[in-house]
Amino acid sequence: MRNFVWAEELDADRIDDVRALLLAARETDGRPEVEPDGPLPGEFSGPRHLLCFSGEGAAAELVGYAHLDVRGDAFGRQVAELIVHPAHRRRGHGTALLEEVLRHADRLRIWSHGDHPAAARLAERFGLSRARELLVMSASSAEQEWPKPRLPEGVRLRTFVPGQDEEAVIAVNARAFDWHPEQSQFDVKALREAQRESWFDADGFFLAENAEGRVVGFHWTKVHPANPNRFGGRPVGEVYVVGVDPDAQGGGLGKALTLAGLRHLRQRGLEQVILYVEGDNAPAIAVYRKLGFETVETDVQYAQGS
């Protein structure tokens, strides 16, 4: 017997149950990035949560989970993530989860991480269209030259200072990513919360200042711990966010910032560097390919009614 429970928030016991499911999925799929303790990953924060149980009473087991972000992306579209426990797949739970989410969602977007054929078949069955691709690109730091960055005249690089630079970074972010469904919503509060994460490293957060001392760009790097089922089981660096103020674009600042971060990650001993880029951002993809990056994964977002 299958039962669904919707919740606006998860109590401690439910968080533990969901974490166990996510960790099991990570062991099989390499995703999502979830820690054995602490808060759930950001993509599962906020309302609403859907828990799918198999069995009754004390014997009921959590076999599936969905997070429905009813707050929506920057364009008012609700976004869902669906995960079925690896030990309970191919039993109709994924279909049932999707049906339940669709009954409660409006203008829905659903992520499929890894562009799995089963997800494509399920999307076709429910009339969902392939609306967005997010490419995961990777490069070997040992095989690339990555020369010293050449900055535009009057621009200098320095690293982020916590408690001082938040407003300046968010101002650039807002202008650089006004088109982006997620990054455009990143604010000072979120940046301060990120600084409490174990992976945050101000020494890997590069800022570009112009001659007047105004921040006109940034490159925020990130280091992921080893994941046995992803990227060869080794720690990897990430070109997390590169943002350039539109007024400072066109002079090579974006490439210079990217190179500064890449060289920093290599100096930290990371043999592999990854990044995420929109599949339709041809200019950025071309730049990354020249820097030695190749596409290794594709995430797909399916859309309801478009």
Curated annotation (Swiss-Prot):
Its EC number is 2.3.1.189. Acetyl-CoA 2 binds at residues 242-244, 249-255. GO terms for molecular function: mycothiol synthase activity; protein-N-terminal-alanine acetyltransferase activity. InterPro entries: Acyl_CoA_acyltransferase (IPR016181), GNAT_dom (IPR000182), MshD_Acetyltransferase (IPR050276), Mycothiol_AcTrfase (IPR017813). GO terms for biological process: mycothiol biosynthetic process. Pfam families: Acetyltransf_1. Acetyl-CoA 1 binds at residues 82-84, 90-95. It catalyses: 1D-myo-inositol 2-(L-cysteinylamino)-2-deoxy-alpha-D-glucopyranoside + acetyl-CoA = mycothiol + CoA + H(+). PANTHER family: L-AMINO ACID N-ACETYLTRANSFERASE, MYCOTHIOL ACETYLTRANSFERASE. This is Mycothiol acetyltransferase. It comes from Saccharomonospora viridis (strain ATCC 15386 / DSM 43017 / JCM 3036 / CCUG 5913 / NBRC 12207 / NCIMB 9602 / P101).
